[in-house]
């Protein structure tokens, strides 16, 4: 975007490029082609089994790179070429039509989005800003830990709901017995 804003044509440059311009002309680029992590597709599959209905990748990478990752990992949608403020705007749009949004990130550019998400997850002790903005910090960079965390969270919420229901039922029974004169109130 910086190059386009300065009138430099970079339309035929490779992959996720780092550009070099001189005198308003693109003179070079280094293409960065990140590998898709082996556990990424399996993690998305596990998240779907746990009830995640829709997955969206928000990235600063090119559309070509994003499409490749989404294809390999079975991610439903992507938004590419995003600056940090664009990621935040995209997340707000996604939140409008969703029951709940989990955002996973690891960099300083992710901090505002991690804070805005219903649940922000910082991976691998990313940057200090990301860790401070996140609700959950996964201390290693294994993506499979994300699915494990969602599973454990769902289990904990189930136990919590059961405990609350049990406590309310016991209170109602004791109050009813107390009103009937069959149990002391204290």
Please provide the spans of the model-predicted regions.
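Cytosolic catalytic headpiece
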Residues: 1-119, 151-154
């Amino acid at each position: 975007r910086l190059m386009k804003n300065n009138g430099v044509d970079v339309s035929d440059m490779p992959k996720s490029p780092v550009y070099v311009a001189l005198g308003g002309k693109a003179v070079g680029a280094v293409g960065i082609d990140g590998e898709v992590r082996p556990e990424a597709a399996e993690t998305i599959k596990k998240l779907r089994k746990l009830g995640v209905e829709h997955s969206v990748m928000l990235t600063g990478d090119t559309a070509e790179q994003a499409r490749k990752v989404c294809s390999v990992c079975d991610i439903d949608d992507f938004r590419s070429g995003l600056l940090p403020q664009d990621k935040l705007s995209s997340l707000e749009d996604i939140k409008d039509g969703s029951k709940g949004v989990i955002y996973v990130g690891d960099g300083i550019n992710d901090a505002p989005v991690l804070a805005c998400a219903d649940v922000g997850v910082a991976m691998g002790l990313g940057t200090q800003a990301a860790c401070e903005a996140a609700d959950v910090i996964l201390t290693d960079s294994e993506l499979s830990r994300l699915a494990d965390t969602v599973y454990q969270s769902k289990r904990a919420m189930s136990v919590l709901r059961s405990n609350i229901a049990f406590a309310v039922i016991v209170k109602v029974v004791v109050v009813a017995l107390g009103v009937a004169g069959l149990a002391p109130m204290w």
